[in-house]
């Protein structure tokens, strides 16, 4: 089993908490992207980043002096979004870190795909960014099937905890010999299941922590996730989707 998750926009430098253990698999492609970003004017870069002037200025200056070899942070500690707060990797036990290092991958517009302890530097480049590099219209074309093929080399079962923006770069290439299962964390609204961004991010991070704590390796174990008031709903799930509903475990228990 391999687990895929999204990165976060906010990143920090933390070179002391954990040692870096490995280089990103596609560092050559990352160097290409860095060269491309350095060739852009401020206005061109700001358009790609789709952000305000304060963030654009910070990232433009960051790109100008960026070095992919020094002052690196383990990827899992570099990202600072809600998902990572609930995963709380900085307090994982040694055996739990070993679990995520073996099973978890972070998808990235800049690095492609990362193991938790791969060394990274802070950047801003979302997977949906419109780049024009090597005749590719966007990063989905730039990365192509590379990221999926990396996963396929290691597993025939991918658990998708990533957002649509990022899982899209894997889903479009899935072959019959690999099973990809997506976790949905939502609430029932009439006949529909609605995913709320904040709750979904919280649950994805909590799921990674849950899996690391219990060394989960099977689908049946994943279904037992019951944190943050979520519980598995068998009726809404199928072979490619595991649905976890918020606030319904007590309702089912009373039936």
From Swiss-Prot:
Cellular component per GO, a single term: cytosol
Record InterPro entries: YaaA (IPR005583)
One GO-annotated biological process of the protein: response to hydroperoxide
Top-level taxon in the UniProt lineage: Bacteria
HAMAP family, per the entry: UPF0246 (MF_00652)
Protein family membership: Belongs to the UPF0246 family.
NCBIfam families attached to this UniProt entry: PRK02101.1-4
PANTHER family in the record: PEROXIDE STRESS RESISTANCE PROTEIN YAAA, PEROXIDE STRESS RESPONSE PROTEIN YAAA
This protein's name: UPF0246 protein Cphy_1568
Organism this protein belongs to: Lachnoclostridium phytofermentans (strain ATCC 700394 / DSM 18823 / ISDg) (Clostridium phytofermentans)
